[in-house]
C-alpha cells in the first residue's frame, strides 16, 4: 500500500510537473506534511515503507525566531510538520489566523502576516534544503492546500541556496500540474501495477 504522498509523487513524476525527471521529491503541504520519492522511473518506498517521509525530522538550522520547542503528535520535538503544516504555521504565527488567512493578510501588507509568511518560506526552504543535500532531486513538486500560495515559489527558491551545500542550485521547485487530483491519479497508476519498485 502507498500513502497519499507516494501517490502524489507517482502522479506528478509520471505525467505531471516532474515528468521526464530522473528524481522527483513530492511534498504535500496541508493539514500535515508528507513526502514521497520517485527515482529512476520507480516509486521508492524502502524496507520500512517510509521513504520520503521527512516531515517527522527536526527542522534544520533552528533559530530563535522559530519560537518555543513544540511537541509533535508523534512524540518528538520540533518536527518539520509542526512548522510547515497549515495548523503548525497557524499556531506558531500567533496571529489567530488560519494559514490561508495569513497568506491573504500578507498580500494586503499586514506587517505581522508578512513576517509570518517570510519566516514560513525560510522554514520551508530549510526543510527542503535538507532533502536536496541528501538526495539532490531534479524536481521538487509541491501539492496540498498550502502549495496554492504563489508567494512560496519565488521566496523559497531564493532562500534555498543559502542552505544547500553547493554554489549553485539546479533543483526546480514547481507546483503540482494535476493539483488535488494527483493523489487519485497516482493511486490509479499504482493500482495498474505500473512503476512500483519495492
Protein language model annotation of sequence segments:
Residues 6, 42, 146-147:
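Short, glycine/serine-rich, charged loops/turns that create anion-binding
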Residues 2, 57, 176:
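Hydrophobic residues at beta-strand termini and immediately following loops
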Residues 4, 30, 187:
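Active-site glycine-centered loops adjacent to acidic/histidine catalytic or metal-binding residues
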Residues 1-13, 17-19, 25-27:
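ATP-dependent carbohydrate kinase catalytic cores
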Residues 19-81:
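Glycine-rich phosphate-binding loop of actin/hexokinase-like ATP-binding domains
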Residues 11-21, 61-198:
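ATP-binding/phosphotransfer module of carbohydrate and carboxylate kinases, centering on a glycine-rich
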Residues 5-6, 50, 180:
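A generic "binding-loop/recognition-motif" signal
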Amino acid at each position: 500500500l502507498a500513502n497519499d504522498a507516494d501517490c502524489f509523487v507517482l502522479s506528478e513524476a509520471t505525467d505531471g510537473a516532474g515528468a521526464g525527471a530522473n528524481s522527483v521529491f513530492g511534498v504535500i503541504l496541508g493539514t500535515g506534511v508528507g513526502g514521497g520519492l520517485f527515482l529512476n522511473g520507480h516509486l521508492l518506498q524502502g524496507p520500512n515503507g517510509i521513504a520520503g517521509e521527512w516531515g517527522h525530522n527536526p527542522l534544520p538550522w533552528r533559530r530563535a525566531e522559530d519560537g518555543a520547542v513544540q511537541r509533535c503528535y508523534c512524540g518528538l520535538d520540533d518536527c518539520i510538520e509542526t512548522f510547515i503544516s497549515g495548523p503548525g504555521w497557524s499556531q506558531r504565527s500567533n496571529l489567530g489566523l488560519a494559514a490561508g488567512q495569513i497568506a491573504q493578510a500578507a498580500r494586503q501588507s499586514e506587517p505581522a502576516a508578512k513576517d509570518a509568511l517570510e519566516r514560513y518560506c525560510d522554514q520551508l526552504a530549510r526543510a527542503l534544503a535538507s532533502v536536496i543535500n541528501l538526495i539532490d532531486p531534479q524536481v521538487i513538486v509541491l501539492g496540498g492546500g498550502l502549495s496554492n500560495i504563489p508567494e512560496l515559489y519565488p521566496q523559497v527558491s531564493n532562500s534555498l541556496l543559502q542552505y544547500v551545500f553547493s554554489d549553485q542550485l539546479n533543483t526546480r521547485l514547481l507546483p503540482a500540474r494535476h493539483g488535488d487530483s494527483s493523489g487519485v491519479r497516482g493511486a490509479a497508476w499504482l493500482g495498474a501495477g505500473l512503476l512500483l519498485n519495492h
